């Protein structure tokens, strides 16, 4: 029974787009089933298939996203963490992996010195010697050195654990072709079950979020976080080049998908999208 369900789901997942919009064919199919004398038994069977499809899809989606995260954390803290900490402390630890870390450390130390100087100017009555100020700055420099040394070691751990997570994700994708077909069918049923207004709203939401007027600021933050996570230099030229090209590519893909695919599947949703976007 389960094998037959998966076979049906595979057919739904890889159903090709015909010349007639799917919304029209679905309406005629629903009308035909209502006139069918065996419609009740078919409805029960379709409910069983839908329930099995939902359970399988939710399980596989959770497996697909939770497994790499768990493997990432486990490999980072129990495998790569102890090894890298041991090797990192064997000799004189390397504090900085790139120039961006140096700039942030120097800027923070400079702000600390300026803060001390400001406090001295506000309280001229207090007898603060140059040796005390120098000692406080020295302690702050050691604190920053330890912080950025740990950040550099964590960046190496992140690279190795992320590679393992990617391998686990790819392995799950390769070995779960049947489950992927079920998930595709499940997502198609959800998307096509939405109203035209809901479809248009989601399209506008995602396009404005990722390729809209304010999206470059979000992309800039995301790229900076990723580069810092991997211990790579936060090159402003690379970041500006990325946010000036990647959103344009995404916008082109969105428009092509609307023109090539959604326009055939649900032309009423495309019309609603254009009306809402004007």
Swiss-Prot record:
HAMAP family (UniProt xref): CemA_PxcA
Gene encoding the protein: cemA
One of the GO BP terms on file: potassium ion transport
A cellular component annotation (GO) from this entry: chloroplast inner membrane
Family (UniProt): Belongs to the CemA family.
InterPro entries in UniProt: CemA
Name of the protein: Potassium/proton antiporter CemA
PANTHER family hit by this protein: CHLOROPLAST ENVELOPE MEMBRANE PROTEIN (PTHR33650:SF2), CHLOROPLAST ENVELOPE MEMBRANE PROTEIN-RELATED (PTHR33650)
Record function comment: Contributes to K(+)/H(+) antiport activity by supporting proton efflux to control proton extrusion and homeostasis in chloroplasts in a light-dependent manner to modulate photosynthesis. Prevents excessive induction of non-photochemical quenching (NPQ) under continuous-light conditions. Indirectly promotes efficient inorganic carbon uptake into chloroplasts.
